[in-house]
A protein has these predicted regions:
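Penicillin-recognizing serine hydrolase domain
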Residues: 87-252
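Active-site-adjacent loops and short helices of periplasmic peptidoglycan-processing enzymes
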Residues: 1-126, 135-136
Length: 252
């Protein structure tokens, strides 16, 4: 089922799926340690970007950065991967656009690693599907995307470790439905993009399905007690309803 699949849209943090793809293409050793620099985190607070909480001088592994990128949607993780793998963010973004073109994402152009708004940073639902189909084939990506919680081991800056939690899997039991459960995904938001969501569900028969949505408007009424947002929760429940309908149809 496709609706408005070729309409131009701003992807917000769904961008970070491609950031992860390109990073994994360039990572030879997930356990290699790097040191977070000032340039990895500069400007992020001013841009109101979502971050994992990494600090300059902190030593973490490239695997830690992937979790920081995907679970809390950390722009600091995105920029650190770009700077340390490709030497600079612009160099990394060039690889992102090259990778997108190679995957057949013909209506996509990215200008940053994070999804922060830029008029020249755009894609389509159809291209996002191509991106996610490619990413999901990578075992390392699937492992990160389906993780609920992860703790970066203790550092000088975080003596008790840095605890990370998935923005999507936060809803935990709400992700289960009679025919299966939502096992992973990525959410995103900017005022210009609206609320965006990629989710993947596994049915009881083992088959997997994907739902992608974008441009959802903000809901003022609070639907969740803590964390997340009403609209993000609504997006997740809409996806759950679609998966439930698929499961019901399969059981007929």
């Amino acid at each position: 089922m496709k609706k408005n699949s070729d309409d131009k849209l701003f992807p917000a943090s769904l961008t970070k799926v491609l950031t992860a793809i390109v990073a994994l293409d360039n990572i030879e050793n997930l356990h290699k340690k790097i040191t977070i620099s000032e340039k990895d985190i500069e400007g992020l607070a001013e841009a109101n970007a979502s971050v994992a909480g990494l600090e300059a001088g902190e030593q973490v592994t490239l695997e830690d950065l992937l979790y920081a990128l995907i679970l809390p949607s950390g722009a600091d993780g995105a920029n650190a991967l770009a700077n340390h793998l490709n030497g600079s963010i612009p160099n990394f973004v060039k690889d992102m656009n090259k990778k997108a073109a190679g995957m057949g994402m013909l209506h996509t152009h990215f200008t940053n690693t994070t999804g922060l708004h830029d008029k020249q940073h755009y894609t389509t639902l159809q291209d996002i599907k191509k991106m996610m189909d490619h990413a999901w084939k990578n075992p390392a990506f699937r492992k990160v995307m389906t993780t609920l919680r992860y703790t970066i081991p203790a550092t000088k800056q975080h003596p008790n470790g840095l605890k990370l939690e998935s923005t999507l899997l936060f809803y935990d039991d709400d992700l289960k439905f009679s025919g299966g459960e939502i096992i992973g995904g990525k959410s995103g938001f900017t005022p210009e993009a609206g609320y965006c969501l990629i989710s993947v569900a596994r049915m009881k028969d083992g088959q997997q399905y994907m739902v992608i949505s974008a441009k959802a408007k903000k809901i003022e009424k609070t639907l969740v007690e803590e964390g997340g947002s009403a609209t993000e929760y609504g997006n997740v429940m809409d996806a759950k309803a679609i998966y439930t309908a698929i499961a019901d149809e399969k059981n007929k």
